[in-house]
């Protein structure tokens, strides 16, 4: 069976799964700028660049789009706040498409304590982390198209609502 869950419930299912030892299949959009070939998947808040002043602002405004993208994914940065409406709009206008399936199997934290899902990619031992990607919760919330998870990995309250 398949279900269309609101974003908060979808995230709760994924969190609950990995925190209880379950892996799950994850269909996502890897053509997004925030999905790097270096093993990071993030939704950086590019508008934060506009908050810079002085020489930092001059450096930012002089950067090419490619350099800005590299800068925004090179270290932990503030990310956009993903809403149900943003997610739906990206789906409806084909900005978000299902172009790759992977496995999510754990949670890691960066040096600031921010959580990332640990993703096993099928591209072999490529990238900085040898085939492992670290996908921020914002990226996963925004760009998940589908998941396949064992029904016992679903939180009890959500399972009850689904009649499982």
Give residue ranges: language-model regions.
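Active-site signature of cysteine proteases
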Residues: 1-164
């Amino acid at each position: 069976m398949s279900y269309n869950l609101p974003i908060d419930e979808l995230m709760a299912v994924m969190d609950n799964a990995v925190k209880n030892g379950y892996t799950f299949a994850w269909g996502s959009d890897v053509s997004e700028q925030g999905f790097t070939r270096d093993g990071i998947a993030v939704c950086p808040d590019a508008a934060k660049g506009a908050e810079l002043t002085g020489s930092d602002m001059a450096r930012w405004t002089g950067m090419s789009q490619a350099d800005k993208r590299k800068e925004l994914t090179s270290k932990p940065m503030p990310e956009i706040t993903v809403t149900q409406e943003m997610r739906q709009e990206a789906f409806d206008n084909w900005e978000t498409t299902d172009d790759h399936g992977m496995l999510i199997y754990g949670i890691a934290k960066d040096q600031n304590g921010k959580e990332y899902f640990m993703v096993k990619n099928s591209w072999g031992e490529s990238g900085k982390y040898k085939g492992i990607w670290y996908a921020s919760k914002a990226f996963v919330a925004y760009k998940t198209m589908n998941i396949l998870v064992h029904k016992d990995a679903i939180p009890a309250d959500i399972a009850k609502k689904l009649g499982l």
